[in-house]
Amino acid sequence: MRYAIAVDIGGTFTDLVAYDHDARQVVYSKSPTTYDNFADAIFHCFEKAALTPAEARFLNHGTTLVINALLQRKGARTALVTTKGFRDILEIARGNRPDPFDLHYSRSEPLIPRELRFEVSERMAADGTIVTALDTNELERLAQRLTEEGIESVGIFFMNSYANPAHEEAAARCLQQLMPGAYVTHSTSLTRQWYEYERTSTVAANAYVGPGVDAYIRRLETDLGTGGFGGPLLMMGSNGGLLSVERTCEQPIALVESGPIGGCIGAGAYAEALGLKNVIAFDMGGTTAKCALVEEGRFSVESTYYVGGYTKGFPIQSPVIDIVEVGAGGGSIAWADAQGRLHVGPQSAGSTPGPVCYGRGGDKPTVTDANLVLGRLNPDNFLGGDLTLDVEGARQAIGDLGERLGYHGAEGPLQMAEGILAISTVIMGGAIKQVSVEHGLDPRDFALFCYGGGGPLHGVSLARELSIPLVIIPPEPGNFSAIGMLLADARIDRSETFTGLLDTETIARSRTVFEAMEAEAREALARDFGAQDVLLERHAEMRYRGQRHNIKVPIGRAGDVASIAAAFHRDYKRRYGHADAQAAIELQALHLAAFARQQRPDLACLPRQPDLESKVQERRVHFGGHGTVTARIFRRDALPEGFSDTGPALIEEYGSTTLVWPGDRFEIGTLREIRIHLAGH
């Protein structure tokens, strides 16, 4: 068992990275994602890398299984068991209209339909005292009915259970005994915060995806074991940490953004190694583009995440790195509406059939086809030559779309391709503004850190759109999310509802609660990972008294009222543009993050070995207002540390191509990263 291995299942490709800590060697592979059985793509990656599962010491795994099941409504047949009188909480929700200007607004249907939501007699008071005892006889009759209904999974939510989970825990034990083949989960095993709609939504989502995730992981463990794998399988959590299989099967909702998070962790590690305090992590894959901020070396982790977006989605109370995702990937389809307006995405051609240029039956033009028509992709060296791209097929598809929109003649396909990329740039720029400008931050104060198969190709265009002066392309950007998973630590988050005005007495009470959460987290990390050395971070959700929305503020172990208040005022002003130093501040919740360090690869060993024999070539490439010019083509593994040149240029490697615009200067850094300095910035 030589290798530490990470596998990332993306919307279009599945990536594998294997690192030998002793020999300090690395192996990469990539294979199209297989939607019928995700595990097939994992084993295809093993074959391409000439490795077997028996050579793996451990395997870190990120997957889009959970988010796909939620968005595509492909989960289990699920029932909700709740307190009498609260059957319709999923439909009542918050009773608000998130987008008041959308005249056709409609909220998404609940994951669990009304006929599968059931009430039982029980009630807790807000302080945790029992008002009405749990009727176990009623539960027994309900279990019989659920079995007859063919229910595969049950979510349990009782009012005020965050204050006293006894009834939920008793109901879960009862249903597990009476329905041994069903998946049973309850809200207080996932979150101990108030807000009844959010907790109900969380447990409903967890129950909905639970059977599928459990079956997938157990089958993958079995298949890996058959191949000789004897190490632990660890899952990439949405909080930026690794989770054990047991914890994942109990809390599969913790994987809701499992796939993209690995790249965020990798971006943070590289930013620290390169001495960059502030970077925007930008991941453009085949299906979507994602972005997140690293500010002062840290990611922001949100305690509530909206599946499908705030406007039409639904919330889950689970820690997720603050990441924004838009439907603008390499496979995003370009199309025209009835009014003759051009759109890009969110529909994607995926890996099957894929873009037109893949030659697998796709007939709708995509972002990848547009890049190929403009000369920005090498048709003979895509994925290292594993796939030859059909230039004429892409040109025909884009030309046909252009004809419908009035772009005729020989220049029509070029103009149409430029339009497709311009729209995708605006969409991706909007995502970056959402994580920066909407939080009171200026993207010009950050470096743009680009990875994914399409990130390096679009990074400079995006930086120009936002006036960002520096673009960083890490080694192996096409496999970078998997690299990030090898750089992740184990992490467990705990949270508690905690209310009170910010004063000395409240701070003293909070320390007692934090100490209890810390003891619980230490025990969990020791049990799951054998960890003895644990790092701890404390945060509090706070607001001005009388307000509705909270902000999350870091607080030190020795924090006093003055220092905590100062931190709150500072963060509040940055977020909203003002602060009131005289207003009373109140706490609403406490959050704890506990980390156990894992062995990491040496970043200097991650680039492939240089091939200094490669020769520089040339190709005609279209660069917007610069027209079609001759660009030099470099092989990335032929560029040594310190190499520098000026665009127009393309830097090709397995799985990705970096585009350098005319006049921009690029150089190879100490970790073999590409640094692109935009002209005029």
State where each predicted segment sits.
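C-terminal, non-catalytic interaction/recognition modules in large multi-subunit enzymes and RNPs
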Residues: 9, 137-145, 276, 286, ...
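Glycine-rich phosphate-binding loop of actin/hexokinase-like ATP-binding domains
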Residues: 28-34, 79-85, 105-108, 245, ...
